[in-house]
């Protein structure tokens, strides 16, 4: 299956993060950036991000819960999906831990590492669902 066949396909997953003040991680995997409009502030101009392979939006409220939203523009043929997923996972983890008052330092590396790993796993699970659809 080529990218033209999958062009308008969107997979969205909402993952619960029960430990910190931001309770949800929303992952949107789509070639259509407009699929983000349901989750992000209406004032955000998505045209500014047309070349982005990934984005993370903080301060998102979805179903009355504080959330972060990660967008991944997928490609079946790209070697960079893992890198983009890890990059955006770090941004999301930083937002979540910042909300909890945890700053990145040698004493907080484990908290960051575990949270980045968990978020990256969520992003990749959603991406693999996109590939299979």
Task: Outline where the language-model segments fall.
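N-terminal low-structure segments adjacent to metalloprotease catalytic domains
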Residues: 1-35, 67-69, 105, 128-129, ...
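Short alpha-helical catalytic segment bearing the HExxH-like zincin motif
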Residues: 80-89
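Active-site scaffold of zinc-dependent metalloenzymes
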Residues: 37-79, 92-95
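Compositionally biased, intrinsically disordered low-complexity segments
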Residues: 14-17, 47, 87
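Post-HExxH zinc-binding segment in Zn-dependent metallohydrolases
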Residues: 104-133
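Short coil/turn segments at secondary-structure boundaries
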Residues: 76-80, 104-107
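Catalytic Zn2+-binding segment of zinc metalloproteases
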Residues: 89-106
């Amino acid at each position: 299956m080529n990218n033209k066949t999958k062009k308008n396909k969107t997979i969205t997953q909402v993952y619960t993060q029960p430990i910190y003040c931001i309770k949800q991680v929303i992952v949107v995997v789509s070639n259509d950036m407009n699929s983000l409009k349901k989750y992000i502030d209406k004032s955000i101009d998505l045209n500014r991000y047309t070349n982005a392979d990934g984005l993370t939006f903080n301060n998102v409220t979805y179903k009355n819960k504080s959330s972060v939203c990660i967008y991944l523009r997928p490609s079946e043929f790209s070697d960079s999906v893992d890198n983009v997923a890890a990059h955006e996972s770090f941004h999301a983890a930083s937002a979540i831990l910042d909300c909890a008052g945890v700053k990145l330092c040698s004493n907080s590396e484990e908290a960051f590492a575990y949270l980045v790993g968990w978020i990256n796993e969520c992003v990749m699970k959603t991406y693999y669902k996109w590939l299979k659809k």
